[in-house]
């Protein structure tokens, strides 16, 4: 059933497998094209796996009550006052406060010890300048550990984002989202992760984490044709937004390996099964061996029948030249493929072929539309089964990693081409469009997006509040926000404490959870933490969904 939308937005009237034996996982069907070693069993948590899931899940862990005592506070610490004797103090590059400032070279760090009066949230402002380097802020670090990429040593503790310091000879304030800190002495560490940075000072002030942003979001649906299941799903998502977080897990393509591991260890399934349509195009299919049939849509159908929600990303292999996702390896020029001529968006492949033959469009444009049709044909299977799909195509990175990120206008036009073609030619009115952008200039616009996504790869257990606030700002809080990709789901207690209730948290597949034998590694998340996540009152598992 479809509901025609007569105005620009629709306002919602009301506030969605393997067996237990482990089989060998084929990592040639992974969305990561690079060769990565599998994690070894170095964490005893990997041995905690239960052979038989609990028979009944009847109790839920109550959220931990973090003490918050609001109190006015402000303190500025000059960088030159806290460094070791003998550290060079600079005075000649930019106007500064205090007696001077310090320079942090590549991967160097400096610690600020701050005595705080109460347990509460605090804003931290970094006064910095430099030549385009980047600095991270960590709290509570006690020892040095390997960074995620293995290139340097960083402090453990809670990471609160990386901040690009613009090239300038003037100190600029960089504001960190509210951070929960306890009464007493707190260690705040700044460390460069690229280039060099000059640090003048940090300022710590009290903060009050507000929740009104949840109420503003999620009252409109993109597009003109709205499937009833899509409307129902959006209404449900709006009803839980800011109150609970949906569990979500990516799977190795054409398997349910990761979600089976979760069930074995928690007795529950994630609310959302997250797949990837990367192998549905001609170029993507060429990477599959004969033994690896592309059967993921059938698994998604079965998942939906069992009461789960379905999500699909699309990491798009280049349709011409060398098959790759990455701009640095790609011969395909997407700027030649996009067109502003909307009449082409809804033409069939046969009609487009005629235009290609007479020179009205080029091969790049034709191939783009063909790939869209290949993916649409798979999504149509789910449409025919009345299954709503959370659809997240064309992820955006900070460093323009993928070929579709060439420039903002090309990206936005490509998004528009896809959405209009899917909706009008293929009648895919069951898609909930998720735009995974972190840059405002890449955002296609509210008329083309239902939910905004944020991909954050951070190996410390914090809520990533800075990422949520930055993402919210792209749409002025008009769209619900999901943590669409992460190494693992953050602790629900910390999500609650930070008032950072992502709509869902999409934990990555493969080495981030299991090894090649299909067993949990414990390298990123322990069994005990996973049990907490899936049995917590602030999270929703598959058996707790109530969309109907």
Range-by-range predicted roles:
Residues 44, 49-230:
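Extracytoplasmic
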Residues 479-548:
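Substrate-binding cleft of secreted/luminal carbohydrate-active enzymes
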Residues 23-29:
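Bacterial lipoprotein signal-peptidase II cleavage site
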Residues 19-21:
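C-terminal motif of bacterial Sec signal peptides marking the signal peptidase cleavage site
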Residues 54-60, 205-278, 283-290, 493, ...:
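N-terminal module-boundary/linker segments of secreted carbohydrate-active enzymes
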Residues 283-413, 417, 428:
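Substrate-binding cleft of extracellular glycoside hydrolase catalytic domains
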Residues 248-250, 392-394, 398, 415-440, ...:
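Aromatic-lined carbohydrate-recognition surfaces of secreted/lumenal glycan-active proteins
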Residues 275, 439-462, 508-509:
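Aromatic- and acid-rich polysaccharide-binding/catalytic face
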């Amino acid at each position: 059933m479809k509901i025609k939308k007569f105005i620009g937005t629709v306002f919602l009237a009301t506030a969605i497998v393997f067996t237990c034996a482990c089989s060998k996982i084929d990592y040639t069907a992974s969305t990561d094209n690079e060769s990565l070693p599998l994690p070894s069993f170095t964490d005893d948590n990997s041995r905690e796996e239960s052979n038989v899931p609990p028979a009944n899940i009847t109790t839920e862990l109550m959220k931990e009550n973090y003490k918050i005592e609001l109190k006015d506070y402000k303190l500025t610490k000059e960088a030159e006052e806290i460094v070791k004797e003998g550290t060079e103090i600079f005075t000649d590059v930019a106007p500064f406060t205090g007696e001077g400032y310090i320079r942090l070279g590549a991967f160097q760090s400096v610690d600020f010890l701050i005595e705080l009066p109460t347990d509460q949230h605090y804003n931290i402002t970094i006064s910095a300048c430099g030549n385009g380097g980047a600095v991270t802020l960590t709290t509570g670090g006690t020892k040095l550990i390997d960074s995620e990429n293995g290139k340097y040593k960083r402090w453990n503790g809670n990471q609160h984002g990386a901040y690009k310091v613009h090239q300038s000879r003037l100190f600029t304030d960089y504001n960190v989202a509210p951070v929960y800190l306890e009464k007493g002495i707190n260690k705040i560490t700044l460390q460069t992760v690229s280039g060099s940075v000059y640090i003048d000072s940090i300022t710590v002030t009290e903060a009050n984490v507000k929740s009104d942003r949840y109420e503003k979001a999620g009252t409109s649906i993109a597009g003109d044709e709205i499937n009833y299941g899509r409307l129902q799903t959006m209404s449900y998502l709006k009803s839980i937004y800011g109150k609970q977080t949906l569990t979500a897990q990516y799977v190795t393509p054409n398997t349910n390996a990761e979600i089976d591991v979760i069930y074995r260890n928690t007795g529950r399934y994630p609310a959302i099964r997250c797949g990837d349509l990367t192998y549905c195009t001609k170029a993507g299919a060429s990477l599959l061996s004969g033994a690896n049939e592309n059967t993921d849509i059938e698994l998604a159908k079965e998942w939906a029948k069992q009461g789960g929600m379905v999500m699909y990303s699309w990491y798009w292999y280049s349709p011409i030249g060398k098959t790759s996702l990455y701009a640095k390896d790609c011969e395909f020029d997407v700027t030649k493929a996009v067109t502003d001529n909307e009449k082409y968006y809804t033409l069939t492949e046969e009609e487009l072929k005629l235009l290609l033959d007479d020179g009205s469009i080029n091969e790049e444009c034709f191939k783009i539309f063909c790939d869209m049709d290949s993916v649409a044909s798979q999504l149509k299977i789910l449409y025919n089964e009345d299954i709503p799909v959370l659809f997240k195509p064309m992820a955006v990175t900070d460093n323009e990693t993928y070929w579709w990120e060439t420039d903002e206008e090309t990206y936005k036009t490509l998004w528009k081409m896809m959405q209009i073609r899917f909706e009008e030619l293929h009648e895919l009115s069951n898609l909930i469009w998720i735009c995974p952008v972190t840059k405002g200039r890449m955002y296609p616009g509210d008329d083309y997006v239902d939910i905004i996504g944020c991909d954050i790869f951070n190996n410390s257990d914090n809520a990533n509040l800075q990422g949520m606030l930055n993402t919210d700002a792209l749409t002025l809080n008009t769209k619900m926000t999901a943590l669409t990709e992460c190494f693992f789901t953050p602790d629900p207690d910390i999500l609650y404490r930070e008032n950072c209730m992502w709509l869902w948290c999409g934990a990555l597949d493969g080495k981030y959870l299991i090894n090649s034998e299909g067993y949990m590694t414990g390298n990123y998340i322990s069994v005990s933490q996973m049990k907490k996540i899936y049995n917590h009152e602030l999270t929703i598992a598959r058996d707790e969904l109530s969309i109907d």
